Amino acid sequence: MVGSAIVRHLLAQGVAQSHIITRTHAELDLTNQAAVQEFFAQEKPTQVYLAAAKVGGIHANNVYPADFIYQNLMMQANVIEAAFQNGVQKLLFLGSSCIYPRMAQQPMREDALLTGTLEPTNEPYAIAKIAGIKLCESYNRQYGASHGVDYRSIMPTNLYGPGDNYHPENSHVIPALIRRFHEAKLANAPSVAIWGTGTPRREFLYVDDMAAASVHVMQLPKATYDQHTTPMQSHINAGSGSDVTIAEVAQTIAQTVGCAGQIEFDTSKPDGAPRKWMDSSRLNNLGWQAQVHLREGFAKAYADFLGHL
């Protein structure tokens, strides 16, 4: 999803299609070290956007914790090492807001990293993403001066939009709710069940806004990026700047879809962290702002869902 949005943004900036190299998971398994090394040796890219990841909601993280930590660690390590071995000087790693402690002060600043206990429901994924940040920082520290390595990290909040995964069990909250309300609408269901209490607050960012943020951070002069980060805390948050309750999200999506069923909250299911809202002032001060508001973004996401039925 994010990779496709980055491609759209680069094309809109005037980058030639022939200068953009992409691979689907079917074409290149990033957990296969030899295959990744071969790809970099053949293609010789000059910049890398590392957007690939195994992602999912609370259910998927609970059921497949080993997959989430192993696959993400392997993908990150293989790509970053292969990039270095093949002379790539500029790389941007995309992480996640779940890197921050469960009870971090809100909004979460970049310096909250590693200051407390992680949210248990997605700890393996979070640890993998923290490792990705530290991989970038470690390569910069060891090879920055000698090889010109400049590997950066950006931490998106919860993303949604075209190209999302709408699987009924393994998707994130917005695509899961879009599917659930759409199916309830078709079935004229009197009610729709939502996991948890509906009270947790979350921040959401439209994927094309994230693509713009990613390209913006990648293109910053090194001196500017270094001025706003430190060698041991080099990541930058990317969020919309506001958060909403899950109940509000459900109500807005129901209205977008046109589902009249009663929303019922299953309080026997986990909520996850009580609040996740990121402080994106560092990125805002560097010249980026989110553009797409939730209601507009949900409408675009629902249109994308309908287009893939």
PLM features: residue spans?
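Conserved Rossmann-fold NAD(P)-dependent oxidoreductase catalytic core, especially the SDR/UDP-sugar
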Residues: 77-122, 152
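C-terminal substrate-binding subdomain of Rossmann-fold SDR/epimerase-dehydratase oxidoreductases
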Residues: 7-9, 13-14, 183-309
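N-terminal Rossmann-fold NAD(P) dinucleotide-binding loop
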Residues: 3-4
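NAD(P)-dependent short-chain dehydrogenase/reductase
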Residues: 103-112, 137-222, 241, 251-255
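SDR active-site strand-loop-helix element
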Residues: 23, 48-54, 91-97, 154-156
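Active-site helix of classical SDR
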Residues: 124, 128-131
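NAD(P)H-binding glycine-rich loop region in Rossmannoid oxidoreductase-like domains
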Residues: 33-73, 85
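Adenosine-cofactor binding site in Rossmann-like domains, unifying the SAM/SAH pocket
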Residues: 11-38
